[in-house]
Amino acid sequence: MYHPVVQVLIGLILVIILILGFYHLKKKSCKTDTDCKDNGHHCVRGTCTDISCLEAVKQDIKGINLDPSIRSCNYTPGFYTFNSTTADLQSPFGKTRIYYGDVYATWSSVDYCQSLCLQHNGCIAWEFDDEKESPGQGSCYFYTNSHPALKNSNDTTIMGIARNIL
């Protein structure tokens, strides 16, 4: 048969393959957060994970440029949302800013701005600025460049970057 050293190497390789196979089976694949609801995780790049939203953004959106003062975000269906954040208007991303107009919705102007982005061809990010005096009214902007550059802003802006598409 084979020399004992070769048999040990073959055995070692088989053990490594088994360990990797079990690890791969343990990782649950997903398309949306609801696929991960049984253990409280979120879907990031097709895998259920418990990493922070900010770490997920860095993994999911390659080449994103985040201002160091941005320390958190929130998972929402279809988007990562950032409070008090805007686009860096000097960046190529910021230069694609499209002013949709002032929006007002009785249920949620932020959600309305997000839904308008979903309907706009090429929109990969939205921004809602609640600078108006009337509650729930503000300006809605869209972005189409796939290399986001975000910076900290005043307390009236909310920004959303699309998940799992860039």
From Swiss-Prot:
Pfam families: PAN_1. Its main location: virion. It is a single-pass membrane protein. Disulfide bonds: none annotated. Residues 1-4 are intravirion. Induction: Early structural protein. It comes from the Viruses. InterPro entries: Pan_app. It is found in: Virion membrane; Host cell membrane. Keywords: Early protein, Host cell membrane, Host membrane, Membrane, Transmembrane, Transmembrane helix, Virion. The chain crosses the membrane at residues 5-25. The keyword Membrane applies. GO terms for cellular component: host cell plasma membrane; membrane; virion membrane. Residues 26-166 are virion surface. Belongs to the asfivirus envelope protein p22 family. This is Putative membrane protein 164. It comes from African swine fever virus (isolate Pig/Kenya/KEN-50/1950) (ASFV).
